[in-house]
A protein has these predicted regions:
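Basic, Lys/Arg- and aromatic-enriched nucleic-acid-binding interface segment
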Residues: 1-51, 55, 65, 76-77, ...
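Short helix-to-turn junction characteristic of helix-turn-helix DNA-binding domains
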Residues: 28, 40, 44, 97, ...
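Short basic/aromatic active-site micro-motif
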Residues: 36-38, 44, 137-155
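Short, polar N-cap/turn motifs at the start of nucleic acid-interacting alpha helices
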Residues: 61-68, 137-138, 157-176, 187
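DNA/chromatin major-groove-contacting recognition/catalytic segments
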Residues: 19, 23, 82-85, 92, ...
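Catalytic-site neighborhood detector that most strongly recognizes the C-terminal catalytic loop/helix
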Residues: 7, 15, 71-78, 166-191
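Short alpha-helical segment immediately N-terminal to, or the first helix within
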Residues: 43-44, 57, 151-155, 165, ...
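Active-site/catalytic core of tyrosine-dependent DNA strand-transfer enzymes
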Residues: 19, 66, 75, 87-137
Length: 195
């Protein structure tokens, strides 16, 4: 697990490695009382969405053909609509979840529905237990979002792209990840022609 302390009293940024993420997904899959937890973790790590954005997700906003889902203004922190692109991992998690919903609460409008078909409201206990089973300490649900952003920046993705994917209203918030970019300075100066 990696962490970054921020100046000015801002909250910490924690992220986990890919092997820790695999262990967490495996541990989340054993949560008998929260069978949707595994797919929630997979989707959060693949999209960077906030917990409430995912828990409020309805099937009619998921477009499997175009590989994205829509977050409406009332579901986002900054009140702006956004399209969330889906990679193969996110699509797989959504398909698995669709399967579960079809078997246990067919007709539910919620992606993360309980067996009664109602929207899942809280994952905290199951998530904490899954972290313990995976041997991951001091890791919150929101840290799945930090993990997504950290992985992207470490892969060289522009902070502006990460900002848009996370739905940040300002690049200032996203800049907390800037130091993770492996070659941000080196790549910039290479764009200049030699004199």
């Amino acid at each position: 697990m990696q962490s970054l302390g921020l100046d000015g009293g801002e909250s910490r940024v924690r992220w986990i490695s890919r092997s820790e993420a695999s262990a967490l997904i495996l541990a989340a899959g054993t949560a008998a009382r929260q069978p949707h937890l595994r797919n929630f973790v997979r989707l959060a790590l693949s999209t960077g969405c906030r917990k409430n954005e995912l828990l409020a997700l309805e099937w009619h906003r998921v477009d499997f053909e175009r590989s994205h889902f829509r977050l409406e203004c009332e579901h986002t922190k900054n009140g702006k609509r956004r399209l969330v692109p889906l990679n193969s991992g996110a699509l797989s998690a959504l398909r698995d979840q669709l399967d579960w919903v079809a078997r246990h609460c067919a007709g539910s409008e919620w992606v993360f529905a309980s067996s009664s078909g109602r929207r899942v409201g809280n994952l905290q206990k199951g998530f904490v237990a899954a972290c313990a089973r995976a041997g991951i300490e001091n890791f919150r649900i929101h840290d799945l979002r930090h993990t997504f952003a950290s992985w992207l920046v470490m892969e060289g993705v522009s902070l502006y792209v990460v900002k848009d994917l996370l739905g940040h209203s300002s690049i200032t918030v996203t800049e907390r990840y800037a130091h993770l970019s492996p070659n941000h300075g080196r790549e910039a100066v290479q764009k200049l022609l030699p004199l």
